[in-house]
From Swiss-Prot:
Family: Belongs to the tetrahydrofolate dehydrogenase/cyclohydrolase family.
Name the record gives this protein: Bifunctional protein FolD
Alphabetized PROSITE patterns for the sequence: THF_DHG_CYH_1 (PS00766), THF_DHG_CYH_2 (PS00767)
Catalytic activity reported: (6R)-5,10-methylene-5,6,7,8-tetrahydrofolate + NADP(+) = (6R)-5,10-methenyltetrahydrofolate + NADPH; (6R)-5,10-methenyltetrahydrofolate + H2O = (6R)-10-formyltetrahydrofolate + H(+)
Gene Ontology CC entries for this record: cytosol
Organism: Desulfatibacillum aliphaticivorans
InterPro entries: Aminoacid_DH-like_N_sf, NAD(P)-bd_dom_sf, THF_DH/CycHdrlase, THF_DH/CycHdrlase_cat_dom, THF_DH/CycHdrlase_CS, THF_DH/CycHdrlase_NAD-bd_dom
Matching PANTHER family: C-1-TETRAHYDROFOLATE SYNTHASE, CYTOPLASMIC, C-1-TETRAHYDROFOLATE SYNTHASE, CYTOPLASMIC-RELATED
Length: 302
């Protein structure tokens, strides 16, 4: 019997409807709406596309959205001054700096200059520390891990006491989702193991997982025999493995493959995310959730 599909596209729509409704209610109550600014340096095509999607989503849910495009020649000093301007703008609740930045600019210095209370990506060291402490200290969880946890909860997967194995140790996904799943609270209370591509007998670790979260960036890494029967499998990998011609547009598009052998795994797992259409749509969705939270914190509503 095939596994239940956990579709990020469906969950995204549920959450964005909830955010849109709450924004409308807050506007009626306070006369204000959340503000989100995305700073784009240069014209990297992938970055332009991603920023456009963020701005469109912010507009859809009723935010004030600003796309601040800057020349690739902007100095580090001027970019820091721009961030400082938005840090001190009460109408802005979320500040995003789209990466990658030009080589003459220090990414870490720029990202660390963002006010932690407006760091809706959740990557400022202050927010990383808050996440580690857990509980009421947490303001913004990083968007992809937050999306993963939300998918697990909304799919009705039991996490309390569950064996969770996270394959991958990045600061963006692996480490934060492991930390989130081990905390006290809904969607957590799990027993968590972090493994990676250098782990000895990786398959044996995966085989005992009730919830297997794979974020290694290796296409097809996890084989069906690595999966416990009935497990929940969250495939975070989005690996470009070739191109094909789209039947809809006739244009060349990327062929994407996850870190899990999906076709075989879905016959063993109890639930599984597809690639594409699984975890991917959740990242921008949770960015909207974090921006709404920031607005509520700023206005004494949380």
């Amino acid at each position: 019997m095939s596994a239940k599909l956990i579709k990020g596209t469906d969950i995204r729509e549920e959450i964005l409807e909830e955010v849109t409704k709450e924004v409308a209610e807050l506007k009626e109550k306070t006369g204000k709406v959340p503000g989100l600014v995305t700073i784009l340096v240069g014209e990297n095509p992938a970055s332009v596309s991603y920023v456009t999607l963020k701005i469109k989503t912010a507009h859809r849910v009723g935010f004030t959205e600003i796309q601040d495009n800057q020349s690739p020649d902007i100095s580090e000093e001027d970019l820091l001054a721009l961030i400082d301007k938005y840090n001190n703008d009460d109408s802005i609740n979320g500040i995003l700096v789209q990466l990658p930045l030009p080589k003459h600019i220090d990414d870490k210095k720029i990202l660390n200059a963002i006010d932690p209370d407006k760091d809706v990506d959740g990557f400022h060291p202050v927010n990383v520390g808050r996440l580690m402490i857990g509980g009421d200290e947490v303001k913004f969880a990083p968007c992809t891990p937050a999306g993963i946890q939300e998918m697990i909860v909304r799919a009705g997967v039991e996490t309390s006491g569950a064996e969770v194995v996270v394959v991958g140790r990045s600061n963006i996904v692996g480490k934060p989702i492991a930390n989130m799943m081990v905390q006290k609270g809904p969607g957590a209370n799990s027993t968590v193991t972090i493994v990676h591509t250098r782990t000895k007998d990786l398959a044996a670790h995966c085989q005992r997982a009730d919830i297997l979260i794979v974020a290694a960036g290796v296409p097809g890494l996890v084989k069906p025999e690595w999966i416990k029967k009935g497990a929940c499998v969250i495939d975070v990998g989005v690996n470009r493995v070739g191109t094909k011609i789209s039947e809809k547009t006739g244009k060349e598009i990327a062929v994407l493959r996850g870190d899990v052998d999906f076709d075989a795994a879905k016959e063993i797992a109890g639930s599984i995310t597809p690639v594409p259409g699984g975890v991917g749509p959740m990242t921008i969705t949770m960015l909207m959730v974090n921006t709404l939270k920031s607005f509520k914190f700023a206005n004494g509503l949380m």
